[in-house]
Amino acid sequence: MDDFLKERLVKYDTWLDRGQISFSSKIIPTRESLSAQQWVLPSEQVLDILCNAQSIAVQKCGCRVHFSRCNKPLEVCFLLNKTGEHAIGKGQARSVSLPEAADIVRKADEYGLIHLTLYRRDHEIYALCNCCPCCCHDLQLMKIYNRQDLVVRSEYVAVTDKDLCINCGKCVERCIFDARTFDDSQLLYNSGLCLGCGLCVTVCPARATVMELRDP
C-alpha cells in the first residue's frame, strides 16, 4: 500500500477504534442529478453545504497532486470554516465566494468527479472534495482495499426505466462502483451497489435514469 494511503488509513482506524468517527466520508449526489426532484434533503445538496459554511476556501486536490494518474481539474477541493481559514493562512488554499464555488462544482460535474464530504472527529464537515477513483484516498481504500466501511452512500439511489433505456452504455462507463454492466448488449443494473453519486443520471441521453430517495 502506498505510504500516502497507509498514513490516511492509520488515522481513520485510530479514530474508528476510539469511537470518534463512524465513517470517513459520504457521497453527495451531483446537483444536476437531483434537478428533477421536487424536494431534496438539505444535507444532500452541495450548494446547501457551501451556503451554510461561514467561509469557503479551495485548494488543489492533494490526492491528484500526489498520484497524478489523470488530467482531471486540480483546484476543486473545498475546505470549510476554520479548516479553510487555517489553510489560507499557510498559503495552501485561497478564499472563494459562493458564486465561484458554484462554478467549481459545475466544472467538477462536467468532468465526472464525485462529491465527497469529509468529517472531523467531532462529526463536523470540514471539507467537500470532488474526487476521481484513480487518485482519491477514500475511494481507493474502498475499492482496492475493501474498506467499504469508510465511505457512506448518499440517501439517494439511481433508478433506471428499462423501457426508456436505449442501452447506449454511457452510464456503464460513468459508474465507478460497478453497479452497471453489459450482458449481450443489455444493461444490467445492481442498485445494491449504487452509492448514489448521480453521475449516471447526468450522462443518460434518454433520461431513463433518475435519483430517488432510498428505502429506509
Regions found by a protein language model. Give the residues of each.
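Ferredoxin-type iron-sulfur electron-transfer modules and their immediate structural context
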Residues: 48, 56-164
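Conserved active-site and cofactor/substrate-binding residues in soluble primary-metabolism enzymes
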Residues: 41, 96-99, 166, 195
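Short, cationic-aromatic polyanion-contact patches
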Residues: 132, 196-197
